[in-house]
Amino acid sequence: MPAKGVIQEIIGVVIRAKFPEDEVPEIYNAIEIPLGNGDRLVCEVQQQLGNGVVKAVAMGSTDGLRRGLEVIDTGRPIAVPVGPATLGRVFNVLGDPIDGMGPIGPEVERRPIHRDPPSFEEQNTQAQIFETGIKVIDLIAPFTRGGKTAIFGGAGVGKTVVIQELIANIAKEQSGFSVFAGVGERSREGNDLIHEMKEARIDENTTVFDKTVMVFGQMNEPPGARLRVGLTALTMAEYFRDEGRDILLFIDNIFRFVQAGSEVSSLLGRMPSQVGYQPTLGTEMGELQERITSTKRGSITSMQAVYVPADDYTDPAPATVFSHLDATISLERSIAERAIFPAVDPLASTSRILDPNIVGEEHYRVAQEVKRVLQRYKDLKDIIAILGMEELSDEDKLTVQRARKIELFFSQPFTVAQQFTGRPGKYVPVKKTVESFARLLNGEGDHIPESFFYMQGDFDDVLAAYEASQK
């Protein structure tokens, strides 16, 4: 017989309920409030205050609730469906389908969203490059298979577009399963993403959407849902990993997870920490990030978009994410303003596996030389601004010309942006990327005007465009 209590107090999305003292729900248990119209409001227990009183965070709207309503303890945490039945479906934080394609049957396994991370013995630590088909990422900050990568950027510099392109590329080229968590972002973007994935075909009978699980807790949802939707998606991804698959987990946007935690923390009455964030910021982030890992059975490769408030990388939210990552992709507004997309800053982006023993001598050499040329150009910009190009040595003039071509060559037409740009998307394998930049550095493109390097695939595309213009 489940324990029953009554609502004592409602403050925003936080509900205080009283249970019999010998039947107090455990921390993280789901408690349900029947709403009379056949629906139920699920809340998650966050605090036990003594004398049978608990504080819980609602996963839905608290409109229409009142004191004295009955509360029922389910006796376990929120549990969500896992397995092949979830592919090609869209869920909310509770694991209920929101795509209008009918409910998930009772025969489908459900797992609690709170679980311990894999032990050290189970974890797999081998480093291996994960090809994305995006030149600037593969060359400068290669992803680790089974690693964690974050895409940092302020508002409107293209984080979501990069994430969408990665989903499309990986589904087409590597035919893997993906789990997408929309955390506190725009509902319109989520809707667009679903439609684009339904249109993007892997083959005649399969779309990208058919190989993806989507979980949404968007901007209009209460903070409880935005706080837990990442764990819901992660639980679904862990199932596929434990079945021996290599799975991709996309989280857009991890900052909104922190933001939701901050809202909940304030409503629970905790004293705020630095810059007004919750005192449990590091713990909450660790609980999520430590579960995103590879085991000896399978791997979870995660890509997370991180909104950087006011472009300030020292803000506690992005700074906390940094410590968990294998690679960081930094999107820069000044590059986006020049219409170079993806607007990745190659000098601020890093990867743990950009190592000659992992990516190979040639890749490492080319990447370092590209960085050296770009850094030299950056150093010379002040001189050029004051004295002009004429005052530079011949060697520096050549460096500047090549650096400008490299910057433009890092731009790339994306499949998901095709409808806006009118250019078909290009997937460039790592081998081609390294070869293309090696040719550029060797001087093979010195005679080609820099405009021909903009929005091209590999070096052969640049040559073809230039030769076509000469006819």
Curated annotation (Swiss-Prot):
PROSITE patterns: ATPASE_ALPHA_BETA. Disulfide bonds: none annotated. One of its GO terms (cellular component) is proton-transporting ATP synthase complex. It catalyses: ATP + H2O + 4 H(+)(in) = ADP + phosphate + 5 H(+)(out). GO terms for molecular function: ATP binding; ATP hydrolysis activity; proton-transporting ATP synthase activity, rotational mechanism. SMART domains: AAA. InterPro entries: AAA+_ATPase, ATP-synt_VA_C, ATP_synth_F1_bsu, ATPase_a/bsu_AS, ATPase_alpha/beta_chains, ATPase_F1/V1/A1_a/bsu_N, ATPase_F1/V1/A1_a/bsu_N_sf, ATPase_F1/V1/A1_a/bsu_nucl-bd. F-type ATPases have 2 components, CF(1) - the catalytic core - and CF(0) - the membrane proton channel. CF(1) has five subunits: alpha(3), beta(3), gamma(1), delta(1), epsilon(1). CF(0) has four main subunits: a(1), b(1), b'(1) and c(9-12). This is ATP synthase subunit beta.
